[in-house]
Amino acid sequence: GEPGEQGLQPAREGKTDAAYWNRDYEPGAIERDRLVQQRLAKLGVAVRTFKDHVVFEASEVRGATGEPLQRYSAYRARWWTKWHATTPAVQPIPTALAKKKVAPLPLSRPLPSSSELGYDPVVLWIQPGEEHARKRLRWFVEGPLHSYVQGRNLPAIDGSSKLSAHFRFGTLSPRIAIHAA
């Protein structure tokens, strides 16, 4: 169906007064979120978005006059300066938010397995979920991180973090990773 349509149903039924989500920075997602936010506003539902997938948003790391930085080295230097000046803390989920009523998700069938679709079984190269993400981060920080420059280019060894999927799908925060390193 249309992106965001399922999330609008509780609002249409008058079962919610606010919607919360983490910002996504891909062009298609930005447009989707803008449209959903407009629809929710028409229904009288407040929207609150949060920075989650990045440590600093593009608007937070700028040149001295506020312009976007053109060279990576300048961006990197400004990023680290900002990091050391602010060192954003990892925030726990507010207890007031944790106690809020959450609209139920619509019932759906589980996705079919690769075998059910006629393909060979798939072996996952990462384990999904927050617990596995944190274990992998701990393993990486305690070992391969210290020889990353060499290890990342050697396919025969497990020398990279393999955390990108966890960052992308929100099972690991970049702020947690930077604090761990």
Task: Kindly label every feature range from the protein language model.
Residues 1-87:
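Trp/Phe/Arg-rich N-terminal binding region typifying the photolyase-homology
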Residues 66-181:
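Glycine/tryptophan-enriched, flexible segments
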